Amino acid sequence: MHAQSEFLSSLQRQSQHAFQRSGVVLQGEADWQEAILSAFLQTQTTQRWFCVGDWSFESAFCVGMKQGNRLLGRECDVLLFDARKEFDANSFTAAIGSLVGGGMLLVMTNTAQPQHFAEQWMQTQWQKLIVLEQGKVIPQVSELAIAQRNTEYIEQTHAVSLIEKVVNGHRKRPLVLTADRGRG
């Protein structure tokens, strides 16, 4: 368990430094997954955790499987998603929007072979992430390229300066702010 927990901590540090989100699938028995999560959670002192599914971590904000939309407008460093019993795409996509740059998505999946076409398709999608499998060697992950943070928010900085100009200006004029995507 220590090796997997250390791997997750190392990947998290690397992701934060590169300002890139990382996705990890833990595929194995529930006891094995929960032991790794408990060990990894103990290393987390300042990270905000959100959980979607049947979780009850004391230091995390947890919601039910179909309640991922409750995470909208919030931010987290680690998002834990339980896909072992069922998968709700709407809940997943709403919850994933809360993951900050440099954050980590942890997905729990079963070791059982998928029965239906939809489950088979989901299984192939999870394989595109970093997969930690019970009883298998920890995968090698290449170094992440460091993103240029200071140029990322030029439009946001400009928008804030325009808002300040309207608030502090002499005329009472309306402000219209639009964004191409949801969180802007």
State what each model feature region is.
Residues 19-24, 170-176:
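Pre-Walker A (Motif I) flank of P-loop NTPase domains
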